[in-house]
């Protein structure tokens, strides 16, 4: 079987790796670099990808950066007057990596495993697959970045049972995942993150600092000079990297601008202490998702066996120190953090092509999935952080007599009421045979495959008529949005519980009124007029309370009506039982001695 390459398609930088001689090997690009900037530029119709594009990103307005943030959203990028989808731009980056992987391998590459953030929803995962297809790649598997990282770190450690926290601070995004490693299985227990936090933010703080000191010294604002800003950006990134191994970084930018007396230069030294002081708030922000991930997994820091550092920004000493202090463990830095995700993808590619050890990857769904049911309630079928692939079915019924169709509103979120969650799609199952409410059996099934793609179907078990929907056009949910939804669910828990209880109370009352109406309408009902009058009065009072949303009275009247109905049922039972005895005694002789009689 041909080689399956592993690609880390990053927000800021990307990398490609392949299994070679039983090990994952990162492939260098034509410029000799092991990572490739995720940047595409156009200049006079010429397409430029990678390092060359990054070098002109500030000066060339026809440059696309961080398109990963847009993937799956339907937004477009305009370059030299032409609109491109994020998938098309991503495909250009993938195609570039595919080409230099082919040069290295000396053969055509058609298959790949591509990684995505753990928080990517269905639309974003599908869009990533589409980007691969545009680039001429058959995407064998989409896997979560932290899962890929754990593969690269843990492929030889699968005989141990460990809980691992993956701390992934890249150029543009931040993800935390907690995984359990046991018996060749990697299971994601929880995920959290911040999609607006990364190495770029550290660079930007240094750029602002340099702009500020130059303005104070020379009275010139460099922020309006594109060429100067390009050089400042490159100098800031270099200084940040230098400060990972030294305590002082020299910044020298000759001829950065010009004043009345001639050219001006920027010469300064940035200390690690000053850098850490300026970026302290960013480092502190990384700890919030760490605590959230532990909380979601139901763990404490003492339950974590290993902390894995992923992403180039984890080389920043203050970040390493914060992780160590917060989790009480020395982080594992044994694999290059820039390359570890691509290597993990290559390992999974090796498993697919038969060139590697078989490892089972079990990712999770980041938010609960369900449907809207009577009363505007969200009924959850698949809980948040459920391991995928998974399938879950539940039988529902109609809410009204002779209902010909049901609308299935597919929801994602953590709130009890449907309106507070995100609707992923809506479809209709019609052709339901006429029947009283509650009789038809509608089986709703949620299927999530290994790539996190959701398929929802509804089948009328009476007619076997079926409708389904694949969720592929929902707008993307960012880490921030998911965190917000989870946070809102926690903050509104008591109010949500009240609303859900009220909705359930109304549903119960409505069903009971329906049953009472059927009983009272029965012509052969043995209930006396006094009982009927009492039950009818309570039924009307219950209906009025329901119409007025008077839930205190509703609960009181429902309890009273249930007691009255029980008394009515008991009377009906006793009367029917007494009648049955009379019928039985009067028919005993007939039963024993009867003969059929033919009448002319």
Swiss-Prot record:
Disulfide bonds: none annotated. Residues 569-589 have a biased composition (Polar residues). Induction: By stress conditions e.g. heat shock. Keywords: ATP-binding, Chaperone, Nucleotide-binding, Phosphoprotein, Stress response. The modification Phosphothreonine is found at residue 173. Residues 590-600 have a biased composition (Acidic residues). Residues 569-600 are annotated as: Disordered. GO terms for molecular function: ATP binding; ATP-dependent protein folding chaperone; unfolded protein binding. Pfam families: HSP70. The keyword Repeat does not apply. HAMAP family: DnaK. Acts as a chaperone. Belongs to the heat shock protein 70 family. This is Chaperone protein DnaK. It comes from Erysipelothrix rhusiopathiae. The lineage of its organism: Bacteria, Bacillati, Bacillota, Erysipelotrichia, Erysipelotrichales.
